[in-house]
Curated annotation (Swiss-Prot):
Name recorded for this polypeptide: Large ribosomal subunit protein uL30
Family: Belongs to the universal ribosomal protein uL30 family.
InterPro entries: Ribo_uL30_ferredoxin-like_sf, Ribosomal_uL30_bac-type, Ribosomal_uL30_ferredoxin-like
Pfam families: Ribosomal_L30 (PF00327)
GO molecular function: structural constituent of ribosome
GO biological process per UniProt: translation
Domain of life the protein comes from: Bacteria
GO cellular component: large ribosomal subunit
Region feature Disordered, mapped onto this chain: 1-22
Keyword Ribonucleoprotein attached: yes
Naturally occurring in which organism (per UniProt): Nitrobacter winogradskyi (strain ATCC 25391 / DSM 10237 / CIP 104748 / NCIMB 11846 / Nb-255)
Gene that encodes it: rpmD
Keyword Ribonucleoprotein: yes
NCBIfam families for the chain: rpmD_bact
Length: 64
């Protein structure tokens, strides 16, 4: 029986305006582009690192 992949749900709470281009690219990598948008992603160390990089403009909603 295969394990279900863990997921993490994030929401963009801040604007990407006047942010460094690497932070904007990170938001695109997280599938976010506007305030209030949510994205459900696999819970991997890479995704966790991306969230940590833009933690001031995103919020973790749910971890399953």
């Amino acid at each position: 029986m295969a394990k279900a992949a863990k997921t993490i749900k994030v929401e963009q709470t801040g604007s990407a305006i006047r942010r460094h281009h690497s932070q904007r690219s990170t938001l695109v990598g997280l599938k976010l582009n506007k305030i209030g948008r949510t994205s459900e992603l696999q819970d991997t160390p890479e995704i966790r690192g991306m969230i940590a990089k833009v933690r001031h403009i995103v919020r973790v909603i749910d971890e399953t």
